[in-house]
Amino acid sequence: MAAKDVKFGRDAREGILKGVDTLANAVKVTLGPKGRNVVIEKSFGAPRITKDGVTVAKEIELKDKYENMGAQMLREVASKTNDLAGDGTTTATVLGQAIVREGMKSVAAGMNPMDLKRGIDIAVTKVVENLKSRSKDVAGSEEIAQVGIISANGDREVGEKIAEAMEKVGKEGVITVDESKGLEFELETVEGMQFDRGYLSPYFITNPDKMTVELENPYILIHEKKLSNLQAMLPILEAAVQSGRPLLIIAEDIEGEALATLVVNKLRGGLKVAAVKAPGFGDRRKAMLQDIAILTKGEMISEDLGIKLENVTLGMLGEAKRVTIDKDNTTIVDGAGDEADIKARVNEIRTQIDNTTSDYDREKLQERLAKLAGGVAVIKVGGASEVEVKERKDRVDDALHATRAAVEEGIVPGGGTALLYATKVLEGLKGENDDQTRGIDIVRKAIVAPVRQIATNAGHDGAVISGNLLREDNESQGFNAATDTYEDLVKAGVIDPTKVVRVALQDAASVAGLLITTEAAISEVPEDKSSGGGMPDMGGMGGMGGMGGF
């Protein structure tokens, strides 16, 4: 086991604080509309240029072990905020630094760290309550666009594209961000339910120009197992022919004579039919087939439920307005399912999302939810170079998370003013003792830091700007760093999602509280690798001298 180096008290805290400052100072230059870029060297390829706080934080690794501990703890603040809210990482870092610095000063002055932490927790709870009480619901796509614009550092095109995507697929829909080959932003949307399975045979194609199968007003047979026996299918095929409507078969697989018969019938024109494999695998396949059944008002034909294929009637089949199938995807548009049944299924999936602990399962459940409740939109980000595309993609990701957070918990005035005005609820608030009251004061000072930093990055004196704002009665009034003016920020469209501000403060206070209450730090002593193992260094053997006589 490697030897350890242990530092106590002030020595430990000094190294940690230095690391916190190093990381925070690199991240906070990106805050606000006039924040600067950070250039990150890559081990191969061009350097990366970004204005995304969490990207900067993740790249920082310090040489000194104790400084690195502080930097990594503060990096955790940025990462956690990014995971929970998707934005606000720079704000969280600025808040974390402010709380740690003030807290360390108080500990150095002889105050009890545990009471300081209790005071910090009391203050954070009060501020969060205040933020929630002042939060406003997002009304319309204009406000959604504004949230996106602010989060994308003033890029109007990004905000508008996200608002357009949300309008098309709904608030529950899936919106993904991809890189585009061209220079432009593009938005692609898929209406209805789409799953990644194409036609089983090209002979099913009805539109040779597009190489797609297009079925208008079809019946949909949803079968859980493989279909290879033709006899069992005959009754339902005959019923479909008599109805004169197309038939889509979704099953685990269709093979042998069953597939051959379907193809022959299609080519002869007796039956408009197409077949696709069921999406997903294992239990997830069952769940997705059930989703399709509910969406199309059909029944999933399963031996487990005691339903045999030969006994299936037209009334047990699903229906939809249109189905389009290409070689990779199947899209069901406007299924005949009952609104109430779909809603119940959506709520069931939501409960599963809340209860699952696996990120992978959560992602798959969210995809299912979107397919049932909304749709899927893809925002394709373009640019003149690979570096530019990556930088813009970072901003679009941030903006997308921010708009989702705004829809979830509402909005507050932006530019750090929501936290600035929350200082008023902490005035006169006392803890059980002086040290707890000092903890409350630490938070009161810290939550002014984001406004100051935004003003500083815009070339103004942060202390003067925050002082001017605290004299205001209108809590929507703030400093718009983009235009260098004092104005009503809600009317000007400078708004932040409440969830982002709340999560940033809670995460910053949580990690800062741990650092303030740290009394010892342990790091590994690097092994001395100057000389290898085995024989000791012989320092050279010298010359052998003349041998003479020969």
From Swiss-Prot:
Single Gene Ontology BP annotation: protein refolding
Molecular-function GO terms, alphabetical: ATP binding; ATP-dependent protein folding chaperone; isomerase activity; unfolded protein binding
Pfam families, per database record: Cpn60_TCP1
PROSITE patterns: CHAPERONINS_CPN60
Ranges in a coiled coil: none
Binding site residues for ATP: 30-33, 51, 87-91, 415, 480-482, 496
Cellular location(s): Cytoplasm
Catalytic reaction(s) noted: ATP + H2O + a folded polypeptide = ADP + phosphate + an unfolded polypeptide
EC id: 5.6.1.7
Keywords: ATP-binding, Chaperone, Cytoplasm, Isomerase, Nucleotide-binding
Record GO cellular component, one term: cytoplasm
Subunit-level organization: Forms a cylinder of 14 subunits composed of two heptameric rings stacked back-to-back. Interacts with the co-chaperonin GroES.
Family of the protein in this entry: Belongs to the chaperonin (HSP60) family.
UniProt function note: Together with its co-chaperonin GroES, plays an essential role in assisting protein folding. The GroEL-GroES system forms a nano-cage that allows encapsulation of the non-native substrate proteins and provides a physical environment optimized to promote and accelerate protein folding.
Name the record gives this protein: Chaperonin GroEL 2
Lineage: Bacteria, Pseudomonadati, Pseudomonadota, Alphaproteobacteria, Sphingomonadales
